[in-house]
């Protein structure tokens, strides 16, 4: 797989889970003999939802809820077949969204 690059994007609502998953990916791929760039922290998306506290009136009384999406980027430069195979077998938590591009 000479000259190729694998780009992995991780998304999660919990920053500790995404950091441990990124660390696990980097350790697995470096043990398989490929070079890794990252994990690079990407900007955190902050989604704020505003709702009225009362069911009928009192529009001045509102409550804000926010949902933060943490993202990380990992590049695998010149991946070996052993590294790709170990990536496929890797077990990661369910609350981490993974996008892999070649």
Curated annotation (Swiss-Prot):
It comes from the Bacteria. It holds the Pfam family Ribosomal_S10. GO terms for molecular function: structural constituent of ribosome; tRNA binding. Transmembrane segments: none annotated. One of its GO terms (cellular component) is ribonucleoprotein complex. HAMAP family: Ribosomal_uS10. Belongs to the universal ribosomal protein uS10 family. This is Small ribosomal subunit protein uS10.
